[in-house]
């Protein structure tokens, strides 16, 4: 509901993710617009289903991929906990309870996500790409090091220092 209200320049400036059980049919029908009577604020979230085995998914899940409502993301929460961070799979991460709104980054309770993006069409050389990546890393690292308003957030953010740097514009 907040995302419906927070609009600037005709663009929604918020994001949220909803994680639901694979066998919760009401949740799986939350964006079935063809059924009618669904509040339009439900369009504001990215809905994903938590499931460890795709064989457990009911037919209702696949309906979004067949044009009935919206397709849902698929989250394997146990794998996220078991494997830990990318590149550090030898360290399990039992604190993971959720994800940022697009599920690029696993998060513990009270934790924030810290993401940056490199837009390749603006990069003219490999040297510049490396320079931009280093700057973004430093910016992320510094933003994660600042004092937070909520003590639980500060503790978990400073302990994990989770960040991500994405690359976009590859085909341009």
Predicted regions and their residues:
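Conserved, charged catalytic cores of large soluble enzymes
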Residues: 4-94, 167-172
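Function-dense linear segments that define catalytic or interfacial modules
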Residues: 64-172
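Metallocofactor- and cofactor-centric catalytic cores in central/energy metabolism, strongly enriched
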Residues: 1
């Amino acid at each position: 509901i907040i995302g419906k209200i927070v609009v600037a320049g005709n663009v929604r400036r918020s994001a949220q993710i909803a994680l639901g059980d694979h066998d919760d049919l009401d949740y799986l029908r939350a964006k079935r617009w063809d059924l009618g009577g669904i509040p339009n604020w439900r369009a504001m979230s990215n809905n994903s289903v938590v499931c460890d085995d795709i064989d457990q998914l009911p037919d209702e899940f696949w309906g979004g991929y067949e044009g009935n409502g919206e397709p849902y993301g698929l989250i394997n929460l146990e794998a996220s906990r078991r494997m830990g961070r990318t590149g550090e799979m030898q360290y399990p991460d039992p604190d993971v309870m959720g994800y940022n709104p697009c599920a690029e980054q696993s998060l513990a309770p009270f934790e924030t996500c810290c993401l940056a993006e490199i837009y390749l069409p603006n990069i003219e050389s490999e040297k510049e790409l490396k320079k931009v990546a280093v700057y973004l890393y430093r910016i992320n690292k510094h933003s994660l090091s600042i004092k937070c308003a909520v003590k639980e957030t500060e503790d978990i953010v400073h302990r994990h220092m989770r960040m991500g740097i994405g690359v976009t514009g590859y085909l341009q």
